[in-house]
Amino acid sequence: MADQLTEEQIAEFKEAFSLFDKDGDGTITTKELGTVMRSLGQNPTEAELQDMINEVNADGNGTIDFPEFLTMMARKMKDTDSEEEIREAFRVFDKDGNGYISAAELRHVMTNLGEKLTDEEVDEMIREADIDGDGQVNYEEFVQMMTAK
């Protein structure tokens, strides 16, 4: 299933994987998965985390390696009810709930994920997604960015 991904997608997922893989050992544990999900405002139980890992843990060792992670992401991308997931992701970024993601909100979430971005990098991300040029990202722009192939 992962063979349907573009090289660019694989590179993006590699970056995401390394955000999860806090100790850099090439695998994601339930603890690491929990840390990242909580930093995104989710609050999964230990059992839910274990289920998520078991779903994709092909070799049964209780952790997710990069090929398993790719399979999971490819499945998620095929999953068509992603509208709700995108809306949820938008809410994570839109801290004050005003319907827009500002540079400050984007920086805050990225910092929580362990990504230290310069102001210039944050502004660049906003510019790329900001279709109407108002300096922030509304929901429609966010959807466009998230679903861009």
Swiss-Prot record:
One of its GO terms (cellular component) is myosin II complex. The modification N-acetylalanine is found at A2. Residues 8-43, 44-79, 81-116, 117-149 form the EF-hand domain. Ca(2+) 2 binds at D59, N61, T63, E68. Gene3D superfamilies: EF-hand. Pfam families: EF-hand_7. Ca(2+) 4 binds at D130, D132, D134, Q136, E141. GO terms for molecular function: calcium ion binding. It comes from the Eukaryota. Ca(2+) 1 binds at D21, D23, D25, T27, E32. Keywords: Acetylation, Calcium, Metal-binding, Methylation, Repeat. The modification N6,N6,N6-trimethyllysine is found at K116. Ca(2+) 3 binds at D94, D96, N98, Y100, E105. CDD domains: EFh. Belongs to the calmodulin family. This protein has four functional calcium-binding sites. Calmodulin acts as part of a calcium signal transduction pathway by mediating the control of a large number of enzymes, ion channels, aquaporins and other proteins through calcium-binding. Calcium-binding is required for the activation of calmodulin. Among the enzymes to be stimulated by the calmodulin-calcium complex are a number of protein kinases, such as myosin light-chain kinases and calmodulin-dependent protein kinase type II (CaMK2), and phosphatases. This is Calmodulin. It comes from Myxine glutinosa (Atlantic hagfish).
